[in-house]
Amino acid sequence: LSPRETTAETTGDSSGNGSAETGMNRYYVYSSKEFLGCEYELSAAIEAASAERSGVVVDGEDRYLWRKSRPDRSEIDELTSMEEGTALRSSRERCLQAILDSENLSADVEGLLEQGRTSLQILQQELKGYDILNLSGCTLEEVLYYVGEHHAVYAETGNDEVVLIIGYGPENVELYDPSAGSVHLMNLDTAKDVMSAAGNRFLSYVPAAASQ
């Protein structure tokens, strides 16, 4: 299934954050049988697709951005260990750096944060070859799709702390947690409560259209 060819394509930058500086992104929702509609916010499109048994979301370039189906378990091997001294740095800095490290990229994340750049802006600038997705408003269950695709999910947990969701199973999620100085498991229901209380603020990323 793909969007109708007569519908306008996405314009502006391909940040995937629901709106671009020079235009508006459109996200197309399908069930297994039919086209269900178009949304301008990715989180709204995912919410609509998640209500379907086999819902999917695609963009104007026919890329699948989300599917309801995902593996029962997943783990991102590149992020299952943590270097010493991580707890001495801000969790925001360390999580951003860990994402870049996993893609063999380097940047002065500390300096960019000091300049007032947001996490979204830093990833858009430095994570070459990927489109960054603002998944704020999605549920934890919904964003686990990206972990299943082996892309970490950057998640706020409150009090200016963040973690990376790097794995999951039927009962737990695996967290790269700089504030704790460790990679550890958290009960899925507990994680839902923590992240919901923090506003369900998530980021992830998918290969840019030209990279696929």
Name these PLM-found stretches:
Residues 1-23, 74:
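N-terminal, intrinsically disordered, polar/charged segments of Gram-positive cell-envelope systems
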Residues 4-5, 67-70, 204-212:
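Short beta-strand-to-coil "C-cap" segments at the C-terminal boundary of structured domains/repeats
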Residues 16-35, 56, 62-64, 69-72:
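Short aromatic-glycine-(Arg/Gly/Cys) micro-motifs in beta-strand/loop hairpins
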Residues 21-25, 50-53, 149, 168-171:
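A short, compositionally biased
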Residues 34-39, 183-184:
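Surface-exposed loop/edge segments in extracytoplasmic proteins
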Residues 37-44, 66-72, 164-170:
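Surface-exposed flexible segments
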Residues 39-59:
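A short, charged, amphipathic alpha-helix used as a generic interaction element across diverse proteins
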Residues 74-83, 87-88, 92-211:
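Conserved active-site-adjacent core of cysteine acyl-enzyme catalytic domains
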